[in-house]
């Protein structure tokens, strides 16, 4: 983004410091493009700092349309089902970077676990399970548990059950009355 060249202002890994761009501009190259944007993806919170060839890109997490995402305040912050993941993953990756503490938990129930991509099945994935929402709220590291329970309660009441779920199309299954619809 625009702050890539200002190390103290930058959201990035420690290796992305703009050296290549600086070398090119020092030699006369001009810069173009979207300096205020980025192509980010939702990534495993506890992934290593640099690549693991055995894992490849399995640290990415793109099954969010089948669940919800919550931030540190315990609240949803995006319409996870606005479109298919191919059209939203980079946009939502950036949105996650703008959340408090730059993370989000993805929440799924047992009805959709068979739909999750293989990247959710690697042994390095951070995963917690619980028998109740209250129990889950205590296991989500960095999340306000009281707000999370409230958010899930509102979510569960808002989900339309009169429309059959079909994961292969925009089926019209949605919510009613939430600040951020799905």
Q: Regions from the language model: what does each represent?
A:
Residues 1-11:
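Single conserved hydrophobic/aromatic residue that forms the stacking wall/gate
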Residues 5, 19-20:
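Extended, hydrophobic alpha-helical segments in both membrane/secreted and soluble proteins
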Residues 14-17, 25-182:
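Mobile, glycine/GP-rich and aromatic-enriched active-site lid/loop segments adjacent to catalytic centers
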